[in-house]
């Protein structure tokens, strides 16, 4: 991986890094900042799709793999949870429409799309303040959590 000594010249998004290195998303090789493993191609695509920022350690670019994103998202939730509010309350607090707010998923860190924000409003689900940022759940993580609850319920029933 190339070194970026000048912080002003560093790309902070994966597509920008690919442009700077004159490569493509499928050919870029980048390590996880936490576990140091090289991201697989699907993880590179997920990182770019989630619009996450690249971090630099000793002038070298790092991303984060799927397992580490899940793990450290949970740690951040446990350490920095502040409060939970409904969508209407969040709009009043921020004085901004819900659809104009950047709200990421609790687990996978994907930005919630308008349909996922609407689902929170319709189902009366709360948004959670974690480390000063409001979080919700994307459809994928919400469905996975529901499946996990059902599985646990079946295991505990006799």
UniProtKB/Swiss-Prot annotation:
TM helices/strands, residue ranges: none
ZnF start-end (unnamed): 32-68, 105-141
Keywords assigned by UniProt, alphabetized: Activator, DNA-binding, Early protein, Host cytoplasm, Host nucleus, Host-virus interaction, Inhibition of host innate immune response by virus, Inhibition of host IRF3 by virus, Inhibition of host RLR pathway by virus, Metal-binding, Modulation of host cell apoptosis by virus, Oncogene, Transcription, Transcription regulation, Viral immunoevasion, Zinc, Zinc-finger
Key word Cytoplasm present: no
Annotated InterPro entries: E6 (IPR001334), E6_sf (IPR038575)
One family name in Pfam for this protein: E6
GO cellular component: host cell cytoplasm; host cell nucleus
Gene Ontology MF terms in the entry: DNA binding; PDZ domain binding; zinc ion binding
Entry function: This protein has transforming activity in vitro. Plays a major role in the induction and maintenance of cellular transformation. Acts mainly as an oncoprotein by stimulating the destruction of many host cell key regulatory proteins. E6 associates with host UBE3A/E6-AP ubiquitin-protein ligase, and inactivates tumor suppressors TP53 and TP73 by targeting them to the 26S proteasome for degradation. In turn, DNA damage and chromosomal instabilities increase and lead to cell proliferation and cancer development.
Family (UniProt): Belongs to the papillomaviridae E6 protein family.
Protein name (Swiss-Prot/TrEMBL): Protein E6
Species whose genome carries this gene: Human papillomavirus 45
């Amino acid at each position: 991986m190339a070194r970026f000594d000048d912080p002003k010249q560093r790309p902070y998004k994966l597509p920008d890094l690919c442009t700077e290195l004159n490569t493509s998303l499928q050919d870029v090789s980048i390590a996880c900042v936490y576990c140091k493993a090289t991201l697989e191609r699907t993880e590179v695509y997920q990182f770019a799709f989630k619009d996450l920022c690249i971090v630099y350690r000793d002038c070298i670019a790092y991303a984060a793999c799927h397992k580490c994103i899940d793990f450290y998202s949970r740690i951040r939730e446990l350490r920095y949870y502040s409060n939970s509010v409904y969508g209407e309350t969040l709009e009043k607090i921020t004085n901004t429409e819900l659809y104009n707010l950047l709200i990421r998923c609790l687990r996978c860190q994907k930005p919630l799309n308008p349909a996922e924000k609407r689902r929170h409003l319709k189902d009366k689900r709360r948004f959670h303040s974690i480390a000063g940022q409001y979080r919700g759940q994307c459809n994928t993580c919400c469905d996975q959590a529901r499946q996990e609850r059902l599985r646990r319920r079946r295991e505990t029933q006799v």
